Amino acid sequence: MESTQSIGIRELLEAGVHFGHQAKRWNPKMKRYIFAERAGVHIIDLDQTLDLLERALNFIRGVAEAGQDVLFVGTKKQAQITIAEQAIRCGQPYVAERYIGGLLTNFRTIRPRIEYFKQLSREVEETPEEERSGKEWFARLREYQKLRRNFAGITEMERLPGAVYVVDPKREELLVREANRLRIPVVALTDTNCDPDVIDYVIPGNDDAIRSISLITRLIADAVIEGRGEESAAEERPVPPAVEEAQMVEEGRVPAGGEEQPGEPEAEAFEEAAGEPEDSTEEEAAEEQAASQAAPVGEGDESEER
């Protein structure tokens, strides 16, 4: 198990944690965490990252030691597998595919749907092979697959978490607003295009590169395990098929969303190392807007356009 005492600037550099977004995409509120600008890309101050990471890990240990849950959230393609694997490893709930509006603010209302999903899961798993055909079976299977996308990681979440850990708080704006409203502390891997003012424990770092996400998320999971005084809590549990399928679709492809800069090879090299940001699809944006309207959480700052 790795601790920040064995993590230094070199490890953060190797993981690409220092690469921010293109300077033109920055949020000025992140200025205090930026070391420099190079080839049009902001470079994050890793000395601050180390200090703030240790602060965040100490907080997470305290939450776990108190017996409270830490909800892991990261729905972008680069984060899905890591979020699921590390949350499972430390026995915590997670959202790796789609955050349902109102999960926190309307938890009592959503909880019965989670119980229904658990019941449906048992029915699907226990259905004999010879009965797995016909219109009724496929209708049930489609419903199961849809609910699995929403609830697979939170089936054991019986109460609101003591904290949430987020990869890319800009993408997960709805979750952050709900947590802020309920005064649930937010720990977040926060890139240079994010608003740090809505985050309780900012970890300045690259939230697009897989290695950066994996390193920070693994340390968060280690802190949970340390806080509970346990070994890995659930190593035998596999990553849900829906998450694996989503990752397989993307295998061998660079997530879309970044703007190319023809004629600036150095800038392109920085963008490649930093990890291309992934934009939400129009369908996902519409779903999130509908969810937000269905479960209002109060006024929040609008995220700047990527």
Curated annotation (Swiss-Prot):
One of its GO terms (molecular function) is structural constituent of ribosome. The keyword Hydrolase does not apply. GO terms for biological process: translation. InterPro entries: Ribosomal_uS2 (IPR001865), Ribosomal_uS2_bac/mit/plastid (IPR005706), Ribosomal_uS2_CS (IPR018130), Ribosomal_uS2_flav_dom_sf (IPR023591). GO terms for cellular component: cytosolic small ribosomal subunit. Keywords: Ribonucleoprotein, Ribosomal protein. Residues 229-238 have a biased composition (Basic and acidic residues). PROSITE patterns: RIBOSOMAL_S2_1. Residues 261-287 have a biased composition (Acidic residues). Residues 229-306 are annotated as: Disordered. PANTHER family: 30S RIBOSOMAL PROTEIN S2 PROKARYOTIC AND ORGANELLAR (PTHR12534), SMALL RIBOSOMAL SUBUNIT PROTEIN US2M (PTHR12534:SF0). Belongs to the universal ribosomal protein uS2 family. This is Small ribosomal subunit protein uS2. The gene is rpsB.
